[in-house]
Amino acid sequence: MEENLKGLYAALLVPFDENGQVKEEGLKAIAKNAIENEELDGLYVNGSSGENFLINTEQKKQIFKIAKEAVGDDVKMIAQIGSLDLNEAIELGKYATELGYDALSAVTPFYYPLSFEEIKQYYFDLIEATQNKMIIYSIPDLTGVNIDVDQFGELFNHEKIIGVKYTAPNFFLLERLRKAYPDKLIFSGFDEMLIQAVISGVDGAIGSTYNVNGKRSRQIFELAQQGKVDEAYQVQHETNDIIAKILELGLYPTLKEILKYRGIDSGLPKRPFAPFNEENRAALDELVNKYNL
């Protein structure tokens, strides 16, 4: 197992201006906030929380570069390169590897109903081209792709496929994976189910709300690992109250607005996402003040 990659990661948010361009200084500040203020172990860059599937190849490269330069070489870095265009994914993977990212990750190909053999070859092609370590990004609610225990085994047979970012509510499958593949990394991808994932034996977690609520997430992770389940649940309950309100107000716009309370130029969501609704400002003020966000 890649012990050095265990831990808690921010699924990095990306600030955009009104024209959909990346705000470089804002991105640096968001990256530094995750490590220095939220005390996380690393960054997961260009995933769903970075609105990755709304941006072009050059913007993805720009984000990889800025994020890496912002936090330096001592921070764990995972580059999400998944794309429906295999050539783009390879190009991004080579670029992130050259920048010194510790591992790559790639969402399962979506939209087209591919066979498992086609999906497996997609990952093998990425590894062959980049020669970097790979973490499968499984998020079936958004991709429609469900991989079973035996199919994960076929993927994990490749020595460079070191684990999975598991963003699914199926804890039976998670338990089966943990039992079957004890030497592979499993990262939880659902912030609101962190305690259940830790009890199931995950090695770390990657989350969007960790950008603003990372310290509570670490409390949950460490308390649950220590067997202090009741205490961990108290923090998870509080965290889920926060998450429920953020989801009600709009996930990405609200996370970015919370960062603005910290003086970070966190910009706008990328269209077609709508900006934060100012009619919800009083509710957000209350949330930030109540939970010291």
UniProtKB/Swiss-Prot annotation:
Pathway: Amino-sugar metabolism; N-acetylneuraminate degradation; D-fructose 6-phosphate from N-acetylneuraminate: step 1/5. The active site is at Y137 (proton donor), K165 (schiff-base intermediate with substrate). It holds the Pfam family DHDPS. InterPro entries: Aldolase_TIM, DapA-like, NanA, Schiff_base-form_aldolases_AS. One of its GO terms (molecular function) is N-acetylneuraminate lyase activity. It catalyses: aceneuramate = aldehydo-N-acetyl-D-mannosamine + pyruvate. Transmembrane segments: none annotated. It is an enzyme of class 4 (lyase). Keywords: Carbohydrate metabolism, Cytoplasm, Lyase, Schiff base. The keyword Methyltransferase does not apply. One of its GO terms (biological process) is carbohydrate metabolic process. GO terms for cellular component: cytosol. Its EC number is 4.1.3.3. It is found in: Cytoplasm. Aceneuramate binds at S48, S49, T167, G189, D191, E192, S208. It comes from the Bacteria. Belongs to the DapA family. NanA subfamily. Catalyzes the reversible aldol cleavage of N-acetylneuraminic acid (sialic acid; Neu5Ac) to form pyruvate and N-acetylmannosamine (ManNAc) via a Schiff base intermediate. Homotetramer. This is N-acetylneuraminate lyase. The gene is nanA.
